[in-house]
Amino acid sequence: MPVNALTNSFVLGAAGGGVEWGTVIVTVITFAILLALLKKFAWGPLKEVMDKRERDINRDIDEAEEAKLNAQKLEEENKKTLKQTQDEVQRILEDARVQARKQHEEIIHEANIRANGMIETAQSEINSEKERALADINNQVSELSVLIASKVLKKEISEQDQKELVDKYLKEAGDK
């Protein structure tokens, strides 16, 4: 029966023309068989494909969220590591500054100690030379005194001669 005839029979049946129950039953049975076949062969596999697709999409979303969380964790760890590195660099720089100051102070202290040592050595040498010079002068004065005394003993001299003699010996001592 063509589709137009089936439609006409329903329309006519509704209009009071009578329903062909055989056709209706065959149509309902055919429709039920078609639904059962669609459910078994099309709807089930289609539903499985749709469910699998839904699971895949949900899994992909979960993986994307997990990847996003991991990326955020890594970013936070990187920021923390960067901060720690910057803090470490600052600490190292501060330690270097402190060490440089200490070395500077030590160098100055050592230089002062050396300078003071050199000054003390120089003063000691100056004092030694001064004492030697005074000893030499005393020796020369002693020698002159002995010489003058021996000459005085050998001859009696006047005051004028004595002054000339002392001046002469002092001049000789100054030349030595």
UniProtKB/Swiss-Prot annotation:
Keyword Transmembrane helix attached: yes
UniProt entry tagged with the keyword Transport: yes
Bilayer disposition of the protein: Single-pass membrane protein
One annotated Gene Ontology cellular component of this protein: plasma membrane
MF GO annotations: proton-transporting ATP synthase activity, rotational mechanism; proton-transporting ATPase activity, rotational mechanism
Membrane-spanning intervals of the chain: 18-38
Compartment list: Cell membrane
Pfam families: ATP-synt_B
Keywords: ATP synthesis, Cell membrane, CF(0), Hydrogen ion transport, Ion transport, Membrane, Transmembrane, Transmembrane helix, Transport
Protein family membership: Belongs to the ATPase B chain family.
Its biological purpose: F(1)F(0) ATP synthase produces ATP from ADP in the presence of a proton or sodium gradient. F-type ATPases consist of two structural domains, F(1) containing the extramembraneous catalytic core and F(0) containing the membrane proton channel, linked together by a central stalk and a peripheral stalk. During catalysis, ATP synthesis in the catalytic domain of F(1) is coupled via a rotary mechanism of the central stalk subunits to proton translocation. Component of the F(0) channel, it forms part of the peripheral stalk, linking F(1) to F(0).
Subunit details: F-type ATPases have 2 components, F(1) - the catalytic core - and F(0) - the membrane proton channel. F(1) has five subunits: alpha(3), beta(3), gamma(1), delta(1), epsilon(1). F(0) has three main subunits: a(1), b(2) and c(10-14). The alpha and beta chains form an alternating ring which encloses part of the gamma chain. F(1) is attached to F(0) by a central stalk formed by the gamma and epsilon chains, while a peripheral stalk is formed by the delta and b chains.
Protein name (Swiss-Prot/TrEMBL): ATP synthase subunit b
Gene source species: Staphylococcus haemolyticus (strain JCSC1435)
Gene expressing this chain: atpF
